[in-house]
Structures are given as structure tokens and as C-alpha cells.
A protein has these predicted regions:
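Acidic, glycine-anchored loop motifs typical of Ca2+
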Residues: 135-144
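C-terminal motif of bacterial Sec signal peptides marking the signal peptidase cleavage site
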Residues: 13-16
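Predominantly extracellular/luminal cell-surface or secreted proteins
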Residues: 130-134
Length: 230
């Protein structure tokens, strides 16, 4: 399975619209300027919905403690992890996190914000970033989202609106099965020698299956060992 992140970031920016949109508000209606107490990092996690993965529910490296059994608890976990500058795993394809900032991020046309990721050679897992402008000023991620174009946008091998459905294992310490919108199927392997938590399927998702949708990028990392180890 192609393991790529789908990262959803709620960023308050000053200019982002479709050509068909009719904007009636003025900039001042929704622009939130920086203040002396503004910080560069995200200040709130609205939602944390990872795909299944080896670090999900994991109590050592992953930092879970078994109490993340509701969406609210999962969001609180993710917020604290990022505050402590620890990683937050998004699992397999489609996992996402929605964060907000205490000020608007100006769209200068250059690099206006950054998203940290896995920088190890052979473990590069690119993400898709979406942004949203808080036009109604209610501080919630409830308006139109826009996917930022990247180096792979528009290429034939890039699949838009790709989806993967994950299925809860019938018993502990088993792989997570998945199917996708292209007619493929597979599994997220259970690595008992490394991560022995009972389930790689998020504990706070009550349904026996859930579907994540996003943009699928061409695979760039391959199993060179022939054993699935590297």
C-alpha cells in the first residue's frame, strides 16, 4: 500500500478563493492580525483522525496512554504532542490533522508557513496540505477548503479524490485490511517485533470501517530488502 500522508491544516489566510467566488466581506471582516502574544505555531487542534498505523495507540514512541477513546481525547493528545515538539503519526494513507492559529497567515506568494515531516532518507512521506480562511470569524474550520498545489499537481500519476477504506481487525494483534477506490486491496501489517499494542486501528473510531479521501501521490519509496523491512 502506498503510505502517504494526507495533512489537513486549518490556516487563516488573507487571500484564497475560486475564480467563481463572490467575496462580499472586506479584508477587515475576517483578518486576524498578529499581536504581541501571537505565536508562530498552531494553537489548537480541531480534529485528529489518522489512518491505522504502527504508532497509533502505541504507548512508547507514539505517546498514547490508552485514554484516547474519544475524538476529543485524541485531539487533546495531538495538541500536547505538538506542544512538546513530538511527532504526531498520521498512519497510512488519508490520515489527517486539523489545526488552527491565533492569527491570519498572510499569503505573500512565497513560503508563508511550514509543516514538519519525516526527514530520514528512505522514510520521506510527503503530505497534502489544505487551507481554509475563517471568513465568518467564528474560529471554526467550517468553511471552504482549498488544496495547495504542489510539485506533483496535475501529473498523470497523481490521483485526485482517491479513497481508502480501513477495516477493524476481528481480534487483537492482527493486520488492518483495506480496499481503495481503484479496486485494490491489501493490509497494514502488524509488526509484533516492534509495536505490540493490540490494535493499529484508532481506538476512538467506533465504526468497524472508515473511509479517508485525498490526493494519492506516486510511490517513491520501495521495499529494497525484499522482506518489507526497508
Amino acid at each position: 500500500m502506498k503510505k502517504y500522508f494526507y495533512l489537513l491544516v486549518a490556516i487563516l489566510i488573507t487571500s484564497s478563493c475560486n475564480t467563481d467566488d463572490v467575496i462580499t466581506e472586506t479584508l477587515e471582516d475576517h483578518y486576524r492580525a498578529k499581536t504581541e502574544i501571537s505565536v508562530a505555531e498552531q494553537t489548537i487542534v480541531f480534529e485528529y483522525t489518522p489512518a491505522p498505523g504502527q504508532f497509533i495507540n502505541e504507548t512508547k514512541t507514539g505517546g498514547f496512554d490508552g485514554t484516547q477513546t474519544t475524538p476529543e481525547a485524541a485531539a487533546t493528545y495531538a495538541a500536547q504532542r505538538m506542544k512538546d515538539e513530538n511527532f504526531v503519526s498520521l498512519g497510512g494513507f488519508g490520515g489527517y490533522i486539523v489545526v488552527g492559529f491565533d492569527h491570519s497567515i498572510d499569503n505573500s506568494g512565497g513560503y508563508d508557513f511550514g509543516v514538519k515531516g519525516n526527514s530520514f532518507k528512505g522514510s520521506s512521506e510527503p503530505g497534502i496540505v489544505w487551507v481554509m480562511q475563517d471568513q465568518n470569524g467564528n474560529g471554526l474550520p467550517d468553511e471552504t477548503w482549498y488544496e495547495l498545489a504542489g510539485s506533483e499537481t496535475g501529473k498523470p500519476e497523481t490521483i485526485q479524490n482517491y479513497s481508502v477504506t480501513y477495516y477493524r481487525p476481528s481480534e487483537p494483534q492482527k493486520p488492518v485490511q483495506w480496499t481503495d477506490s481503484e479496486g485494490n486491496s491489501g493490509q497494514i501489517d502488524y509488526w509484533k517485533q516492534y509495536h505490540r499494542q493490540d490494535y493499529y486501528y484508532p481506538l476512538w473510531i467506533e465504526e468497524d470501517s472508515y473511509t479517508l479521501i485525498g490526493t494519492c501521490l506516486k510511490a517513491r519509496n520501495y521495499d529494497t530488502s525484499g522482506k518489507g523491512t526497508y
